[in-house]
């Protein structure tokens, strides 16, 4: 295969333009990840529930590489995120993965991020792939470093039984952010959403932070729809993004409280009785802003 697997199925995260640090409030996990990458012949696997920001931590690593805020031993490395489903698609997963392995033998200073790495463990038609053996040459030379990511359930189901993988890959537990951390994450996400949509959130930092606190509180654990099984920060980010979408739908270049209200009342992330209660809080918490903008909050029966 002559084409580059890295270029076709991967994304160079070190070439992405980051408006803000993608890994807000994740310094502890980032340090742990960097320490593993600095350990000879060791790779890392990030393990945590869906939607808690495992990919954001790897993006945070790429961001630090861009800034040069990284130990000298890792300077000059590129971080590639590879699309796992595309590697195992069309029943030729073995060919594509082997082509990737062979390509990496010719590369230097590559950090390969494989999300949903458990999918590759079962990609072979003749049983689980021995990923540690396949990447062994690059790992031994120290020129290729691997980061995997998976959920707690998939780690226990697929990975724990592969003793060679467990020896090579240091497990890094990624916890759900606290409410305070999630507020920080949402605040730092606003510039990115403004850039993506061309729509501004035009309030003072004090009002913005109160908006984020409200969104985070209304999507706290026991208020979430169980079947969605999403966590902080994703479940809160969904509501924030919906407010920006509502402004775009209205052909506005600013997010107003009308759009935040629409996002809150229409969210599928929390139960209907929660929405009713939270709208009462919303109406009182932002009373002055709602009156100023002429927004009437109706509480569903």
Where are the regions a protein language model picked out?
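AAA+ P-loop NTPase nucleotide-binding core of proteostasis motors
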Residues: 1-301
